[in-house]
Amino acid sequence: MRGRSAPSPARLLLDQLRDERGRRVVLVSHCLLNENTRYAGGATRPGAVAEAVGELIAAGYGIHQLPCPERLAWGGVLKPHSLHLYHSKGRLLYPLRGLLLRAFVVWTRMVYRRLARQVVRDVADYQRSGITVAGMVGIGASPSCGVTTTLDIRASLEVVAACPTAALTRDVMNERAVLGCRRKGEGLFIAALDRQLRRRGLQVPAFEHDLAAELRGSQQTLLTPGALRTLDGLGTPGD
C-alpha cells in the first residue's frame, strides 16, 4: 500500500504560520449569492439570499461561489437559448419542440461536463491544501442545481409554450412552470458533478436550498437538517 504523499512546501508554510482561516469551505450555488442570474420571475432578493449566506458566515465557513451553469450554457445572464419555445404553441417551432428539447439537453450536458470538471479540480485543490470541503448547497426544483428535487423540463416547457405572452406572470412562472413541474431527482449539473467526483474518488456532502420556501416567503436553514446525500457518483437518485 502506498503511503500518503508528503505535504507540499506551501502546505507546510501554512501549517507553520497558523493564520486565522477556518480551513472549512462550502460550495454554494451561484444564485444564492447573486439572484441577478435567476430565471426571469424567480428572483426574490435584490442580490444575495442574506439568511443563507449569513448562516454560513456565522458557522465559520468560507463560501466558494459555484459558476451559474445555465448562464454559461444558455446564452448569458438572461438565458436566451432557453426561451425559443416560449409562447410557441400554434406556431412553426411548436411541432419541433421534442427534437429541439433533445438537442438542447445534449448541448447542456456537454457544457456542464466541462464545468463539473473544473469544480472537481477546485475540490481536489482545497483538499490537497488541508481545507475541508464541508458541503455543497444546491437549489431545489432547479433543472441544473437540484440535489434531490429537479424540474421536469418537458412539462415546464409545455406550460410556457401554451401561455400567451400577455398572460405570463410571475405567479404562472413560479407556481405552474417551476414548482408545479417539480420531480424527484438531481439536476443536470449536479449529475455531472456526481460523475466527476466519482472518477476522482472524492465525496462532498450535499444540501439543498428550498426554492419553494424562498418563493413563498418562508425562512429556512441550510445546514441544520444535515446533508441530504453525498455527491460521489454513488446512490444517485433516479431520473
State each model region's role:
Residues 98, 102, 106-109, 116, ...:
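Internal, conserved structured core segments that host functional sites
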Residues 3-5, 21, 90-118, 124-128, ...:
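Divalent-metal-activated hydrolytic enzyme cores
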Residues 1-44:
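Active-site and ligand/interface coordination hotspots across diverse enzymes
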Residues 2, 9-21, 48-59, 117-134:
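Short amphipathic alpha-helices and their capping/turn segments at secondary-structure boundaries
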Residues 35-36, 73-75, 142-148, 152, ...:
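Short catalytic/ligand-binding loop motif for oxyanion handling, primarily in non-cytosolic enzymes
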Residues 46-100:
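Short, surface-exposed acidic-centric catalytic microdomains
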Residues 27, 63-67, 132-139, 205-210:
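A structural signal for short, well-ordered beta-strand segments and their strand-loop junctions
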Residues 141-164, 185-189, 193:
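Short Gly/Thr/Asp-enriched flexible loops that form oxyanion-binding sites at enzyme active sites
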